[in-house]
Amino acid sequence: MNNDRLKNEYIRILKEQIEQSGIKFKYFATITYRFKQTSLSKVSSDNAELRRTIRSFYDEPIRVWSFIEEHLDPTRPHFGGYHRHLLIEEASPVRWRRPSRRMERFLLEHDPETLFAIRMGGAVSDQSKWNLMKRVLQLDSSVPNGHLGLDLQCIYDQEGALGYCCKQGVGSFDPSNSDIDFGALKNHATQTRQKMLFN
């Protein structure tokens, strides 16, 4: 099976996972280390910690998919090191109606108008939600505070974001730090291996 077919099959399986689990990813984050990070296990560990940070802050099991990519441009200082992409679900409407204590403290300090709107039963703007998610990501020590270290975008094309995350192939997905059904991925890996051996 050639790389393009394998990648397309992998994306198809991930899309099925999205449909079956009802995930609606809202945010696409690109996180670049301050330095050339060459330890894959450290990057995976950082993904696990960042996922815990998000869930702890919102006090909700927000689903995250993590991808690890290599810097491929030999003219750049991070060449051969890794950076991360994350697809992140938005906090639920219930959570926005009844924010966690950490959310309330953060909003009181950084966005009191939004906290007032919540307490008055009003709507929270997408911009306010985005601002809070960016601050939450920056709470994690592995995420640089500067604009070059973290790029957070709202997702308007989930399929396009998924395709972008898989552009370096199936090895970029970090399943141990992603909310996904391992059975489907394992079955796919087994079937792919069998096709390669017997075709």
Regions found by a protein language model. Give the residues of each.
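Right-hand nucleic-acid polymerase module
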Residues: 1-82, 90-199
